[in-house]
Amino acid sequence: MNPVAMTSDLTGNARQLCARFAKASLGRALWQLTNTLPAFALLWLLMAWSVLSGWGYGWTLLLALPTAGLYVRLFIIQHDCGHGSYFASRRANQWVGCCLGLITLFPFGYWKKTHAVHHGTSGNLDRREFGDVRTLTVKEYRARSRLGRFFYRCYRSMPVLLGLGPIFQFVIKHRIPFNLPLSWRREWHSVLLNNLTLLLAVVACSLALGWHVVLLVQLPMLLIAGALGVWLFYVQHTFEHAYWLRQKDWDSNQAAVDGSSYYDLPRVLHWLTGNIGYHHIHHLAPRIPNYRLRAAFESSPLLRRAPRLTLRTSLECVRMKLWDEDRGRMVGFPG
């Protein structure tokens, strides 16, 4: 099918998709929280116990893997609360989103606002602001100084994106959001409240368990979860035939469908990642809660023709570094 025709059809069906699947289910939302939050808490306590009892730190690191997976699932629930899709009640979305922000370390109000900007500007070369992995065009890269190109190469390397990136997000960007306009008072209040509550929680846990236990538990879990989260976001928008256009030609519906991938994961990984692999559907209709994304995907043959990635083919995204405006595709660094 012609990509333009496919996008045209999808645009026409977007309202129907929203109306049919953009409905919160209290039962499914509560069940999702019930099978995620207690399991996360139990694994976190087991990690702490493994440190306190002297089992050997290898057991702690092993437990960090499933704990990090459940962290990602909790983050997706918070993400849905930010879109107002998880519960029908706005107040419930607000309260649950704020509470989960104490676990994910993402201030709910701040993240909600910047993520909305991402949805409104994804794939727009003239609006590369919040919530994107910074992407230069080939011409922009070549116009930079040698030092500028070096720094961009470092930034786009996997050790930096998946290693230093999560540390930057957790420790700096969401603690002191230097890029946040001062006029966004509600979002600043969200950051300050989240920081204060986290400080009190860390002090309380440190007094109860010891600061070294908190550090030895939180650090590996957050690094693994952060790397998983960054990778998911990376492959959702960074693939060869992605979508980037200037403002005058940019279309939000086309950006949603052509600029977001369908990450075809094993069922257990879809469960852990809250079905965010159906990312093209999420961008087309953000009010669909994660527990209905798969049903939306299976309802339309057109939606199953979205840019598809598997675990194996997603590795090819690693070499995608620049957007070539002339060729209309992502490319690697020039030789």
Residue ranges and their predicted role:
Residues S8-D9, S89-R91, H270-L272:
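Short helix-capping and inter-helix turn/linker motifs at the boundaries of alpha-helical repeat units
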Residues L43, G82, Y86-F87, W244, ...:
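Active-site-flanking alpha-helical
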Residues A64-W95:
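Long, highly hydrophobic alpha-helical transmembrane signal-anchor segments
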Residues L74-H83, W111-G123, L232-H241, L272-I288:
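Histidine-centered catalytic micro-motifs
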Residues D251-H270:
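Cytosolic juxtamembrane regulatory segments of multi-pass membrane proteins
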